[in-house]
Amino acid sequence: MNIEDSCISCIDTDWSYQLARRMEKEKTNPVLGYRTAGSAAETATGDMLYREMKAIGLTDVTRDTFSLDGWEFEKAVLKFTDDDGQEHTFQMGGYQTNFETDGFEDYELVYLGKGIAADYEGMNVKGKLVMVEINQRDEWWISFPVYQAYLRGAAALIAVQANGYGEIAESALNAQDIAGPDFAPAFSLSQADARILKRSLRNKISACKDNTTDSEDTHNTLEQDAALLRRSSLKVSLDARSRVIPDTTAGNITGKIQGTETDSMILLSAHYDSYFDGFQDDNAAVAMILGIARSLVKGGYKPAHTLVFCAMAAEEWGIIDSKYDWSTGAYNQVFRVHPDWQGKVIADLNFELPAHAHNRQDAIRCTYEYADFIRQFTDSLTVPKEAYPDGITVLSPIETWSDDFSMAIAGIPSTVNDFSAGPFMQNYYHSQYDNQDVYQEAVYQFHHECYLKLIIAIDRLVLPPMNFSNTMNAVAESIHENALSFADPEQNVLLRNLQTITASAENIYDKICQINAEYATLSDSDARIAFRHKWEYAGLELLKTFRKAQDYLVRLNWQDEVIFPQEAASKNIRQLEKASRALSEGNITDALKALYRVDNNMYAFLFDEEVYYHFTEYILHQPKDRLMWGAGRIMHHENLYGIVQKLKQRMEEETPELDSEIRRLEAALRRQKAYYKDDIRYLNTSVNKLSAMLDNIYNNLLSF
């Protein structure tokens, strides 16, 4: 039995499963769970994981502490007595906001549809609880209706998931990062409980002597419900304790298997904070990385690189009033606690929700540069049909959903088991139904084996297996897809330079593969160490170039999607051109549809100007340390709030005069075209810098 098989034989998924269940013990809310950033429950769980790392034989086990904003959510219980005298008690979920009562306190509750600005017209909600129904996956995030309610004077907003999340059952609650201020309170209520409240509102209205509404009509749209049910209110009682704790501490728990040939490291990461029980997200992942560590130790594996196992705190949330308020623990680990990991860690294998099949086909999502190596690895796997009938694939680039993004922008090439596209997200994610009932043993076993093998495969490398041609091809494709004729000279220069650097990157990758293959032929320990030392500088330069590529090329749009620098302006130009053409033809409706897709201007249609302003400015003009991994990733913004409101007014006019609005759109279009040209020039400069770095690496590789 070879060493890999020996380690695989030591895998015990029952041990991992039981550890995942033990992580559920500590909770801030005794009924619902929650193990939140900086809370006593998170700290106690971290202490347990610290002891577990020691017990399985990891060395240098540490609690790496850092500052963050914490949250303790103890309870949110809503009581209501209906017209028949029946008392109802509803357990509500929480968000990272401040709200404390002295036992049960009485409130007036109103229902306001989707909670957009129009729903508040003619309503006085001061001091009241405002119940709304939202779809965070397909429409807007919780932060917008919450802040809208706060500005109108509401005591708190109660959000019901209409669709998008928590679809598994009408009793499902949901939790997400608030991405907003802590002084605008919010809670989560299930559809089933909301239906009881809505029925009582409907009954009150029906009881009015001048009303003929059918009290049993449950087929209304949200808009119809909002128009009807806003005419009444209910008396309810709320007992809640949700407390945000600014500037507290949390800790990432790390342990190691010491390397024998190099100071470089391979990192495995998962987060141990959670909403509700968090069995899949992310107990099963933390338990899996420790299960893999345990198997490697028991199997007697002596790695060349130091293997680091890190249970991250505060992935779900960790900073007040920031759009980029998640992945707090990971960002702090590599930028503040251990900046020395940058340039030393050759790969981060991050894990999310790994004990459930999110699709018929499994996927490893990774940075562009590692895609070829990962694909070669997955081609060697035998994937059990009972886990994934359609096998396994490789996806790029990484996304912002999880800690691997923070790792990548720090210059650490990262991967994650892909989880974001499957039905689990709509049904179970961040709800009380993410529990042991969604456990799939075959999937968990396969992931233990797959990633143990991947660790060993990476550990056998001398040089990071980076193919920068994948990155450059992706940049070129993004330009070809949306080429703009007014910038042809700049685009053509860039595309030629991309062809040059792509060829160079392919040559480098071929050489990297050759060097890694040569190392594999060495059996003498001293010869292997000497061979690694010979190529150490080249490895450092590859990681340095990767970090620069992340700095130069990775940007975000207003929906947190990973894009290249010119893509935001390119999309805006297309939409502004559509809007301008539509207005020239007097078609305000189509113009507004196009403007809806420019940057974050969908919110200009739906919410008060202060809401739009707040959630724009807190990205553009907030200290970098509060933007963390999102700092500097959005470069431009086109504020269309005024013109959107004006065009909505014009729609009410019989023969609207649109010359002024057309000129304003033309000005916006000129700005975006200038941004686009600047972005293309910036890209060209960046590609030239990266090309020079790659040329130096290639010359270094040829010099030995």
Regions found by a protein language model. Name each.
Residues 2, 10-14, 18-21, 25-126:
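Noncatalytic luminal/extracellular "stalk/propeptide" segments of secretory-pathway proteins
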Residues 3-10, 30-40, 111, 133-139, ...:
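Second-shell loop/turn segments in exported
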Residues 4, 89-122, 178-280, 290-301:
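Soluble metallo-hydrolase cores and metallopeptidase-like ectodomains found primarily
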Residues 91-188, 385, 389-393:
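Extracellular/luminal Protease-associated
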Residues 124-125, 145-155, 172-178, 330-340, ...:
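Mature extracellular/periplasmic domains of secretome proteins
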Residues 137-144, 148, 249-252, 274-369:
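Acidic/histidine-rich catalytic neighborhood of metal-dependent amide-processing enzymes
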Residues 161, 248, 345, 353-477:
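Active-site-adjacent substrate-binding region
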Residues 449, 459-704:
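C-terminal non-catalytic alpha-helical accessory regions
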